[in-house]
């Protein structure tokens, strides 16, 4: 298994952390428990807690499914845009920095 450490991976880690912060803040504002949001989202409590921590396992940023990204804000009574940070990381950096032959 390869460990990613490029700038795009740091950007993704920061982005995942911001999503986690937003999820936690919105859950607290709605006075809901992990169990409440997990149940309403169709997730396990454990999975929901991982998303709120921003990590799927230590050192690995959370990477929620599209379904989870749509279900969690609905469970919280907010829009998807309330969860997603405004600045989207450019995940193409590795591709853009590769030599032209690597793109063929």
Residue ranges and their predicted role:
Residues 31-57:
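Short alpha-helical DNA-recognition segment
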Residues 2-6, 74, 81-104:
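Short, charged recognition helix plus adjacent turn
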Residues 24-25, 35, 70:
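Residues within the helices of the helix-turn-helix
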Residues 55-74:
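Short, basic-rich loop-to-helix N-cap that marks the start of a DNA-contacting helix
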Residues 28, 39, 74:
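Alpha-helical residues within the helix-turn-helix
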Residues 2-31:
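A short, Lys/Arg-rich alpha-helix, primarily the initiator
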Residues 52, 68, 76, 84-87:
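DNA major-groove recognition helix of helix-turn-helix
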């Amino acid at each position: 298994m390869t460990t990613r450490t490029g700038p795009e991976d740091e950007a993704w880690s920061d982005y995942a952390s911001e999503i986690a912060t937003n999820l936690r803040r919105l859950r607290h504002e709605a006075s809901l428990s992990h169990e409440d949001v997990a149940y309403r989202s169709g997730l396990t409590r454990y999975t929901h807690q991982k998303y709120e921590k921003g990590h799927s396992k230590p050192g690995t940023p959370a990477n929620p499914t599209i379904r989870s990204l749509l279900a969690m804000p609905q469970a919280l009574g907010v829009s998807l845009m309330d969860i997603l940070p405004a600045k989207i990381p450019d995940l193409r950096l590795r591709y853009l920095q590769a030599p032209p032959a690597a793109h063929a």
